[in-house]
């Protein structure tokens, strides 16, 4: 079957109530999309891809992956919480929300510069090439100018180490996004979590439109977007399709797409949710790879619970980034020694910092820091 035809540069409107049972699913014989331009899929087309038998889907996604990426190269990222707990949002999965009184977590103040710099040094020495910093707040607008300047200085210092820098700080204004870019930020993470239809069951203190407004501010500043979602929130397959449709029809495909498996933290409203299976994650990875062929697809939270076989299939189907280190914000992560053994068994190698990315903004085409100044390298 031929690949669905290329769409215009403007994403199509969401498809609602449209029957897809008669649509032919993607097959392993489908040629991979051209690496020269993005293809926008309708929601019904993404549903047809998602519903393809898993082995056929993984095979087709692997062909797309190899057309756009070195299949043996995997990016290694480290994520650090620079401000833990006390968040005013009520996201049902999050241990850092101040609404969830039963969670055993003590709120902390914004970290100092030296401790963050030392953590980045350790991450670089361990082989990470991207350092991500997360703060549990609604957004920088809720903190004072001195704290905001401290965050900007964190970005500058980590960037000065020759590492890619990502932050996840909640909702941004266009002015804040521009300041982060000026400080040397590589990418900004702001997950949309799930589909527009299911989002009200995840959070009531902000809207899906709030999420999209931050992504628009980030893209408007020329900063690369890192945006993904969480599998296991109680959503159905249609919501997973809706999540991927939202991401795949942004004005530009995200530079990075994190696929998280819910880590059910005791004391949160979602503590009793059953975890997604490894094959659920593989299906989402493979679909993301087909519909966003040039984006980096990251195995993120919950990877510790995936078997080596699940991870191997995910890498085959298009995953090409992981978080390493023993912790992701407040939850446990896969062991670095286990990762080294898995990479060795699969013949994987680490992606160097500052290779140009196939998707994302200008900040993903920026070279290494030389003498404190940023040197631009166009793809």
Question: What label would you give each PLM region?
Answer:
Residues 2-10, 18-73, 248-379:
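Auxiliary Fe-S-binding modules of radical SAM enzymes
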